[in-house]
A protein has these predicted regions:
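Metal-dependent amide/peptide-bond hydrolase catalytic core
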Residues: 1-2, 186-423
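Hydrophobic/aromatic beta-strand patches that form the interior of the parallel beta-sheet core
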Residues: 77-79, 142, 166-168, 241, ...
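Short acidic loop-to-helix transition motifs that present clustered carboxylates
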Residues: 58-62, 174-175, 356-358
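A short, acidic/glycine-rich surface segment
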Residues: 86-88, 151-153, 175-178, 224-227, ...
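A short linear hydrophobic-aromatic micro-motif
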Residues: 50-54, 177, 349-350, 371-372
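Fold-level recognition of mixed alpha/beta catalytic cores in primary-metabolism enzymes, strongest
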Residues: 106, 112, 116-221, 230, ...
């Protein structure tokens, strides 16, 4: 490790990581309601001299993009983390909004996915700023909204035109894992339509719920045409995640004497690199069309994204992500990991179960930004579990590795970050 890196790492303080993550825990930021935490972060960065863009991704909904400006000529690096958090589960044994430190475990709702990672990327920039080291390239800290809705904040950021030469997304996949592969996700609504009428006269009625039972059964038999990925053996896979039936598109549920004329299921499909949404729809229709052809009363419709009336729905498709492990940004993080820990990363590439998810790297890569996933994990694998926590030691390690990465990347020329095949 060189003296410059050692100087910067001397400004990484685990206590400050705990304090910042704790402050973020105290601000609830469920999807679509990230603005309070965005304003908090904007104030945090402004007080420390960063260039701050409080970006409005839709009316009244904000996300914070902070930049530590370089001196010029160097490659730019984005560290990306989302401010939205998962739904609150019911069996917490602690107050989910009061941070609790027990040994190496910091508890609090949202710290796992992913306010612990947010604290790490922010304190990465702070370690560099406070050391007095000036990077040649810009270091962008993107605190984005709406990742759990398909990456709405990062998508909006790309639509705004911002680009960096490389990026790291600090999802909670482990401080010893460099993840370069994930599945794709598409959410859809499938509707069946019937004809309503009173229970006293069922002639001429069609029960949309009954028709949906046949649709669900057919969906269980969908066979996706794809090239298998041995590293993602469970996918592609379809799940019917919710069902609602009633009268009209408001799904009136309080008139059970009447036949329901609308039924909707919400379907999730996780798919592998090489598949497209068009492929998936064709495979689903190939299962459902014969059903409709054999039943004149069965009418179905597929809607992507699900209707706006389903609050918090996933509005964007997240395509599969497959970054070459020899990409310069991947190798830069690997070098930094070795320099900081004196060891080899436990894994580079596909890491299960983490690669079975999807995340904001899909939008960054689609915009041409080489990237990977590297962030602090927890003792458990499910970000929605009760009593969620993050390991402070993981936050500390990630911060140190990313600080070393920024020193490496931002002193290079932008061309040095291009994929070998693009040179």
């Amino acid at each position: 490790m060189d003296d410059l890196t050692r100087t910067v790492l001397g400004h990484v303080d685990p206590r400050e990581l705990i304090d910042l993550a704790s402050a973020l825990i105290r601000i609830p930021s469920f999807k679509t309601d990230e603005t309070p935490v965005a304003r908090y972060l904007a104030d945090f960065f402004r007080q420390r001299g960063y260039d701050v863009d409080l970006q409005e991704i839709e009316p009244g909904r904000l996300q914070t993009i902070a930049t530590l400006r370089g001196t010029g000529g160097g490659a730019s690096l984005m560290l990306n983390g989302h401010t939205d958090i998962n739904a609150l589960t019911r069996r917490w044994r602690r107050d989910p909004w009061t941070p609790s430190l027990e040994g190496d475990h910091l508890y609090g709702h949202g710290v796992q996915n992913m306010k612990g990672g947010l604290a790490s990327i922010i304190m990465t920039a702070e370690a560099i700023r406070r050391s007095g080291v000036r990077l040649a390239g810009d270091l962008v800290i993107a605190c984005v909204a709406g990742e759990t809705q398909g990456g709405e904040g990062t998508h909006a950021l790309m639509e705004s035109g911002l680009r960096t030469d490389a990026a790291v997304v600090a999802e909670p996949f482990g401080a010893d894992h460099l993840v370069t592969v994930h599945s794709g996700i598409v959410h859809m609504a499938i509707h069946t339509y019937g004809v309503t009428g009173h229970i006293g006269r069922l002639e001429g009625t069609v029960n949309a719920v009954h028709k949906m039972t046949a649709v669900i059964e057919a969906l269980q038999g969908v066979r996706f045409r794809h090239t298998p990925r041995p590293d993602l053996p469970a996918f592609p896979r379809l799940n019917v995640g919710g069902i609602l039936g009633g009268r009209g598109h408001d799904y009136v549920l309080v008139e059970p004497p009447y036949v329901p004329d609308v039924c909707t299921i919400i379907v999730d499909v996780h798919f592998v690199p090489g598949q497209t949404v068009e492929d998936i729809l064709a495979d689903i229709r190939r299962a459902l069309d014969p059903l409709a052809a054999g039943d004149a009363e069965l009418r179905y419709e597929i809607e992507i994204p699900p209707p706006a009336s389903f609050k918090g729905r996933r509005r964007l498709v997240m395509d599969p992500f497959d970054m070459p492990v020899d990409a310069p940004i991947v190798q830069a993080v690997a070098r930094s990991y070795r320099a900081v820990t004196g060891q080899e990363p436990k894994a580079i590439g596909t890491v299960l179960p983490h690669s079975y998810s999807a995340d904001d790297t899909c939008h960054l890569w689609k915009a041409g930004i080489p990237c990977l996933l590297y962030g602090p994990a927890t003792i458990r694998g499910n970000a929605d579990e009760d009593d969620a926590c993050v390991l402070v030691s993981e936050m500390d390690r990630v911060t140190r590795v990313l600080a070393a990465t920024a020193l490496d990347v931002c002193q290079r020329k932008p061309a040095d970050l291009a994929l070998p095949s693009r040179r």
